[in-house]
Every structure is written in C-alpha cells, then in structure tokens.
C-alpha cells in the first residue's frame, strides 16, 4: 500500500526544493521556504517511551466490526494503560518475573514461567503443559469468541486462520483516511481564497483552515502552483510570514509532498547534535517497500546525502543493522500466509532467544525484516502456541533500548498498525506537555491512509476520542486545524 499521491515509479525532483548537495536543512530563500519556523534540526523534542513490556492483551477484533459493547476493554487501572489490540493467544503482553514492563501498565495475573530462560517445549508443543484456553482474567480466546456482528462497519485486520496447513491463506487489510480529494476542486479559486485570507491587516486563519484541511495533498500541490502562477508569489513563503509556532509547523507539513516530508523528518532527526531514534523507528519500520524506496531516492536528490550512510554514522550495533535492513525496502509483501513457514520461523525465534543462553540477534533481524506483516502475524500466533508466551514479551526479555523498540514496532504493525499509531499519539499528549512534532507528523502522514482506523483504535484503547484529547492539549488555530484534519 502506498500513500495517495505518490508517484508510481521513481521520485522526481520537487519544484522549489533544495538542489542535491545543499547541506541546509531547508531550501534557500526564494525556493521552498522552511527556514525559521520549524524546531531546530538537532532538537531532542521526542520524549522517551518506556523501553519494554506491553499491556495485557485485549483481544483482536474479528472481521465484521468493532467488538460488541461488552467486548471493549475496561477502563485502565489508575496509573495504567489499556490493552494492545490484536495480540495472539497465549500469555499476553505482561512481562514475567524478572522482566520489566512499561511503568504503570497493569499486568495480567501471572502464570508459572520458572526461573531464567523459558522451559524447552514438550512434545505436546507447550512448555510445562497445555496452553491455557483463555487469556488471564477470563478475556475471550483469540479470535473466535469476540462478538462483532453488531459492528459490521468496522474495517478490521482479519485474524489469521488457526488451521496450520502449508497452504497459504489470504489476509486483507482495509484502511481509510479522514481527508479525501475535494469534489469540484478549483486550484485557482482556492489560491484566491488563501490570498485574500492573508491580504491586508491580520490573517483570516479560519479561511486557511477551511481550505487546507479539506484538500488532499495532491490538491494542495496544485493550489501552491496556481498561487505562484496567478500572483507571482510563493504561497508557503506568504503563509510563513503570517503564521508561527505549531500552526506554522502543521501548515508546512500539510504542504510538503508525503515522501519529501518523510525524508525531511529523517534528515531532521539525524542532523546536528543527538539523534531522534524514535522518528527513525516510526518511519522506517512502518512504511511499505515502495514508500521506503521513494524516501531513499528523495533523501539523496533533495539533501545530496545517502540515507543508509547517515543511519550508519548516527546509530550503532544491532539497532543500526535493523535500520539498514529497513531502508532497503525489500520486505516480502505477499499477502498470503504460509503456516508451515510460520511454525518453522517460530521455532527458530524460540531457539534464538528464550531457548538458549544469550540471544542470536541476527535471527530476529532476518525474520522480522524480511517476512510480510501477515506472515509475521501467523508466526506470532505459532510462537504463542508453541512457547506459551507471546513474541512481544520474548523480545522485551531478550533485547533492550532502541533495537527492542524497533523490533516491537515491526511486530505491533504486523498485529495492528492503527493501534501502534494510536498509542504513539496517546503518549505524545499524555502527561505534562505535548510532543507537538510527533502529533503533527502522525496526524499529517496518516490523514489520507488510515486515520479513521487510528481514531477507532484510540477510542477502544483509551476510552476517549482522539479529538477530545487533542482539544484538551492544544489551543487556538492550531487546535482547529488538527481537529478539522481528524474529522472532529
């Protein structure tokens, strides 16, 4: 799946963007002006997310829609966070004794893990006996006991079959953005509206919001071109002169072509002192092959730099190797599932981690970097059936730091990509202060892809709407534009 508006082949140079080899993080004056409004390129604006342990599983919704009202996860415990949707059967995301979970996350009732490495699977397939038929605490078994008949409108991520044959089974994923191309679009008329909104004393921010939030990215590029053709002026330069702060950052992000925005975000994350590793993970571990290849080409053409070389110089160890694997854009994207391969991969992952002293990191890297997301979901289910522990918990026990975060991001996207972004948005706004750069980046980049599903998962996971949380954490025109984008 590629972003709407992406070119089918290659990535042509963007008019007005900096020529190859220009080291400035923004194009020069007179071209595509980004200089002063954005946060410093080396800024460490991204908060640290706890490094290990996910909350107890809440069950993955089956095809047909949202869980019935009784199937929603209960309100979080004080200081806790809700369950992560889409987890295969088994132990859930709680970390066994000796492992560290997310701070404040409620842990499911413990089951016997024993000390040290997990027990070697018995011939029956489960260390220590039979796999429990239900989640701890009586939650429904994945996936058949979740009643979704009354919520048929919800586009779900179809659970994989429990039939472990060698025949492939097709899995489809349906997503939908909140922003769609406007009907009866007229770029010249929109350009005139924006010019009038910025003409004279003061700025009509509401007029700007009405146009920008209701046009697709491709239509915004046409408005930008029409503005220059009609008035001989650069629209972005005029907007920058009228706006400031978070509103300026949001407007500029909306007018960047999607691939350029991802490439720009990666450059910003690695430029200057320090590295914003969470940004590298969020982009490189969640994009499709086509998107990644276009990002790599755009990064080279617009900034005159090699993305892989920059990753190698800014990261190290197993985290570096994981990101280098990701920026190749060579993941298998076949949507069918080979259950025999899933069982074999599950066994290999067990033997590379829980079933031995130490960890064979290269085995985890190879499987998680090359298998399709539907195939990884089947592998996670096979792993839970075999090891009596979910693969996310095992990754938390075997890895730490950013490589752990990267591997878990891949697995979370395989389970339920909208839930991953919902969680990122939640932590961008939770607590004191707001990580506005993460909020802007996710809302903008997912607005034409799967923001509808992200909103649905946000409400299911946190018992409040995304719009409600945005309204409470932002203000003014910035809030109005964000709410207009998310459809609130």
Curated annotation (Swiss-Prot):
GO CC terms: collagen-containing extracellular matrix; cytoplasm; endoplasmic reticulum membrane; extracellular exosome; membrane; nucleus; plasma membrane; vesicle membrane
Residue stretches of biased makeup (Pro residues): 1-18
Modified residues (N6-acetyllysine): 233
Any one Gene Ontology BP term: response to calcium ion
Annotated region (3 X 5 AA tandem repeats of G-Y-P-P-X), positions in chain: 5-20
Biased composition (Gly residues): 89-102
Keyword Kinase carried by entry: no
Location of the region described as Disordered in the Swiss-Prot/TrEMBL record: 1-49, 71-143
Pfam family, one: Annexin
Tissue: Isoform 1 is expressed in brain, heart and skeletal muscle. Isoform 2 is more abundant in liver, lung, kidney, spleen, fibroblasts and placenta.
Region (Repeat-rich region): 1-143
A molecular-function term among this protein's GO annotations: calcium ion binding
Annexin repeats: 185-256, 257-328, 340-412, 416-487
Keywords recorded for this protein, A-Z: Acetylation, Annexin, Calcium, Calcium/phospholipid-binding, Repeat
Quaternary assembly: Interacts with PDCD6.
Record remark on domains: A pair of annexin repeats may form one binding site for calcium and phospholipid.
Record family assignment: Belongs to the annexin family.
Job description of the protein: Calcium/phospholipid-binding protein which promotes membrane fusion and is involved in exocytosis.
Protein known as: Annexin A7
Naturally occurring in which organism (per UniProt): Homo sapiens (Human)
């Amino acid at each position: 799946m590629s972003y709407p508006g992406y070119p089918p082949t290659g990535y042509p140079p963007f008019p007005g963007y900096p020529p190859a080899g220009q080291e400035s993080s923004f194009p020069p004056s007179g071209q595509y002006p980004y200089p002063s409004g954005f946060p410093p390129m080396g800024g460490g604006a991204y908060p640290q997310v706890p490094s290990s342990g996910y909350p107890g599983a809440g069950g993955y919704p089956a095809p047909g829609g949202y869980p019935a009202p009784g199937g929603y996860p209960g309100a979080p415990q004080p200081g806790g966070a809700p369950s992560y949707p889409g987890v295969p059967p088994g132990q859930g995301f709680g970390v066994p004794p000796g492992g560290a979970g997310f701070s404040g996350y409620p842990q499911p009732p413990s089951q016997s893990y024993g000390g040290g490495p997990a027990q070697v699977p018995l011939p029956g397939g489960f260390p220590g006996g039979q796999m429990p038929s239900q989640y701890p605490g009586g939650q429904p078994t994945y996936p058949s006991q979740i009643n979704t008949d009354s919520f048929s409108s919800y586009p779900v991520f179809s659970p994989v079959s429990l039939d472990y044959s060698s025949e492939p089974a097709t899995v489809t994923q349906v997503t939908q953005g909140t922003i769609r191309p406007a009907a009866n679009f007229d770029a010249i008329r929109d350009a005139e509206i924006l010019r009038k909104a910025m003409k004279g004393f003061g700025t009509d921010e509401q007029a700007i919001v009405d146009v920008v939030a209701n046009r697709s990215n491709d239509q915004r590029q046409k408005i930008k071109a029409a503005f220059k053709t009609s008035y001989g002026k650069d629209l972005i330069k005029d907007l920058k002169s009228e706006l400031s702060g978070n509103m300026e950052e949001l407007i500029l992000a909306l007018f960047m072509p999607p691939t350029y925005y991802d490439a720009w975000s990666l450059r910003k994350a690695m430029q200057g002192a320090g590295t914003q590793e969470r940004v590298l993970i969020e982009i490189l571990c969640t994009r499709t092959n086509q998107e990644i290849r276009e990002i790599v080409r755009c990064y080279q053409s617009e900034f005159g730099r090699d993305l892989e070389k920059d990753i190698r110089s800014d990261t190290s160890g197993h985290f570096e190797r994981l990101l280098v694997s990701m920026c190749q854009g060579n993941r298998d994207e076949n949507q069918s599932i080979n259950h025999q391969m899933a069982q074999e991969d599950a066994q290999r992952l067990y033997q590379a981690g829980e079933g031995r002293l130490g960890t064979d990191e290269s085995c985890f890297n190879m499987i998680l970097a090359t298998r399709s997301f539907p195939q990884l979901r089947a592998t996670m289910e096979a792993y839970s059936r075999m090891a009596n522990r979910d693969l996310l918990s095992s990754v938390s026990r075997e890895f730490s730091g950013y490589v752990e975060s990267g591997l878990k991001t891949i697995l979370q996207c395989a389970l339920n990509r909208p839930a991953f972004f919902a969680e990122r948005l939640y932590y961008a706004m939770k607590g004191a202060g707001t990580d506005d750069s993460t909020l802007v980046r996710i809302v903008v980049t997912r607005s034409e892809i799967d923001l509808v599903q992200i909103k649905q998962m946000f409400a299911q996971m946190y018992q409040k709407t995304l719009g409600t949380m945005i309204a409470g954490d932002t203000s003014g025109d910035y809030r109005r534009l964000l709410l207009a984008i998310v459809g609130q």
